[in-house]
Regions:
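Residues at the C-termini of beta-strands that transition into short coil/loop
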Residues: 18-20, 94-96, 126-128
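N-terminal beta1-alpha1 cap of cysteine-dependent amidohydrolase-like domains
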Residues: 1-61
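Long, contiguous hydrophobic alpha-helical segments, chiefly transmembrane helices and signal peptides
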Residues: 33-35, 73-77, 125-132
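Short glycine- and Lys/Arg-enriched binding-loop motifs that mark or flank ligand-binding interfaces
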Residues: 32-34, 64-68, 120
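Hydrophobic/aromatic beta-strand patches that form the interior of the parallel beta-sheet core
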Residues: 15-17, 33, 67, 91, ...
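Cysteine-nucleophile active-site neighborhood
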Residues: 39-114
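Short, glycine- and charge-enriched coil/turn segments that flank and shape catalytic ligand pockets
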Residues: 8-11, 22, 81-85, 113-121, ...
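Amide-donor transfer/coupling interface in amidating biosynthetic enzymes
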Residues: 98-157
Length: 157
């Protein structure tokens, strides 16, 4: 993300939060990025973030920008069900994820209603074993090509 901002002439400062680091004051933060990882790492990160659940929720509800990919997205939901264990999520988004049969891997193209045509397409790559189901919020985009949150469900994010 830093490199893409630099390419566009946008200055940025990255503050990495590592395990056991306290969460900084979010009032001056422009964007939070939560990435992914393996199931064991997700469990550890979720336990750490649980301490800051209210701060993250308030940041988002105060129009803060948060990008969550892979397991980071799943952790924002109600729960993530593994084969033999259920990880309680942060309950910030009304979603839940369950382990599926096999991985969904390949290119994905989304149409995002919140972007203006002709620049409303998002192209990416998906590689996930979880199947995420959305409750009461609007998906990030409609799948034009690929799988999305679950097996050919028609939406992603």
């Amino acid at each position: 993300m830093r490199k893409r901002l630099e390419w566009r002439g946008i200055d940025c400062e990255v503050a990495a939060v590592r395990r056991d680091d306290p969460l900084a004051d979010l009032s001056d933060v422009d964007v939070i990025l939560i990435g992914g990882g393996g199931d064991n790492e997700q469990l550890y990160v979720c336990k750490h973030l649980m301490e800051y659940k209210n701060e993250l929720r308030n940041y988002i509800e105060d129009n803060g920008s948060l990008i969550a990919i892979c397991g980071g997205y799943q952790l924002l939901g109600n729960y993530y069900k593994l084969q033999n264990e259920t990880i309680k999520g942060l309950e910030i988004l009304d979603i839940y994820t369950e382990t599926g049969n096999g991985r969904l891997i390949g290119d994905i193209i989304l149409e995002a209603d919140f972007l203006n045509e002709p620049h409303n397409l998002i192209v990416g790559f998906e590689n996930h074993g979880g199947r995420t189901y959305i409750g009461s919020h609007t998906p990030f985009g409609k799948v034009l090509y690929g799988n999305g949150n679950s097996d050919n469900c028609g939406y992603d994010g």
